[in-house]
Amino acid sequence: MSSDSLTPKDTIVPEEQTNQLRQPDLDEDSIHYDPEADDLESLETTASYASTSVSAKVYTKKEVNKGTDIESQPHWGENTSSTHDSDKEEDSNEEIESFPEGGFKAWVVTFGCFLGLIACFGLLNSTGVIESHLQDNQLSSESVSTIGWLFSLFLFVCSASCIISGTYFDRNGFRTIMIVGTVFHVAGLFATANSTKYWHFILSFAIVCGFGNGIVLSPLVSVPAHYFFKRRGTALAMATIGGSVGGVVFPIMLRSFFSMKSDTDPTYGFVWGIRTLGFLDLALLTLSIILVKERLPHVIENSKDGESRWRYILRVYILQCFDAKAFLDMKYLFCVLGTVFSELSINSALTYYGSYATSHGISANDAYTLIMIINVCGIPGRWVPGYLSDKFGRFNVAIATLLTLFIVMFVGWLPFGTNLTNMYVISALYGFCSGSVFSLLPVCCGQISKTEEFGKRYSTMYFVVGFGTLVGIPITGAIISIKTTADYQHYIIFCGLATFVSAVCYIISRAYCVGFKWVRF
């Protein structure tokens, strides 16, 4: 940092140079020194020298060598740093050097999360195939909107249950909560396989399986942050690629089973397809439990005097699991709002993507192929932006992908999405951009959160996201209720505007951190 760029009231002086300020004519009574300050604290020195007031921020040698900036809470649009080194993380005062940033154990943990997320996100990406089969078979007597509420409830329970596992993970670690979530996830799938009535599917799939899926999701997304800081975007992108892999493999497997027929049991293919999915998810989640281990110490909160064990559990894991105070942090608040609108947009668009295609004369098989293209292109869509985010900044790349997705929807899909050839291109672009959104948004949340609090903050965010998903899909269904061409155009506009609002929220969140200037953030 050049001394020419400093004003007399904001001088940064290395520790070894501080004696130069203490000339005989200084007013010694105006020098304040904290003898208890350690290597991580700064000393504030104010002196009167040659009739000029000088305020010096004195850093330890360790901090000077690291280029540390100790900053106050930023105001709206304020650029909180006078310089931004190319290799500095702008928003964190954590000991960056303590993160492994790689190594055998770190990548084994990432691979374990990858396997677990194949099961979690793979099921989420297979709901369209399951919905289509139920609409034509077990639930053929129910309306489309009624069946839609089943899957909307599944997504809500999945998102909302993250809040329980996130709090437990921060306090107790990975393994126990993963075992509990795996039991619910697999048991829900086996119960779904034998369901025949609407209320059966509500209990087995939406509630039990949705709860288990959400329970395992939060720890699997949180653990890579324990091993990576500078390369966190790349690591989480590698882990979440499992969602796209599952989104490609699971629907193909389920459609193959669903096509099986039996003279004595018309549900034979569905039953064994869901059971096979349950066995496969059990194997994947078990391997994840074996391979993954958290690194950072747990957040410990002792019980109060005279507090019973059950009152302690109720207070810590139920009443305090929602981090309401986090919303007082404006950068976190707008990050959550941005995630709500992005998830609402993408989930609503994908839920009715096949219906849109068939309404424009595209066959059911080709519509299924378009969905497969989205999932396949989501694989590089998760990795490439994740890698770029470590080079150019997580928020910067996330905002760029959201704006690109908005352009794809308004410039590509809305005017040209009327024939199969165009839809192939649109599906590829949409899959790439939406995949990057899913992998980058948790990283952005992690960047503005302490690592040991990430699980709770992430789960709190997705608890709120669950409400957005719960109402977003039915609203989209109401928009296309008549299924006219104009209805589907309004459906694209609705999803596109939600994407744009998401980008604006992330821009505001970034502004609270570093202002509007171009820096790597």
From Swiss-Prot:
Residues 125-143, 194-200, 255-269, 347-367, 418-422, 483-487 are extracellular. Keywords: Cell membrane, Glycoprotein, Membrane, Transmembrane, Transmembrane helix, Transport. One of its GO terms (molecular function) is riboflavin transmembrane transporter activity. It is a multi-pass membrane protein. Pfam families: MFS_1. Optimum pH is 7.5. The chain crosses the membrane at residues 104-124, 144-164, 173-193, 201-221, 234-254, 270-290, 326-346, 368-388, 397-417, 423-443, 462-482, 488-508. Residues 1-103, 165-172, 222-233, 291-325, 389-396, 444-461, 509-521 are cytoplasmic. Glycans are attached at N125, N194, N419. Residues 1-33, 65-96 are annotated as: Disordered. One of its GO terms (cellular component) is plasma membrane. Riboflavin transporter involved in riboflavin (vitamin B2) uptake. Does not act in the transport of monocarboxylic acids across the plasma membrane. Belongs to the major facilitator superfamily. Monocarboxylate porter (TC 2.A.1.13) family. This is Riboflavin transporter MCH5. It comes from Saccharomyces cerevisiae (strain ATCC 204508 / S288c) (Baker's yeast).
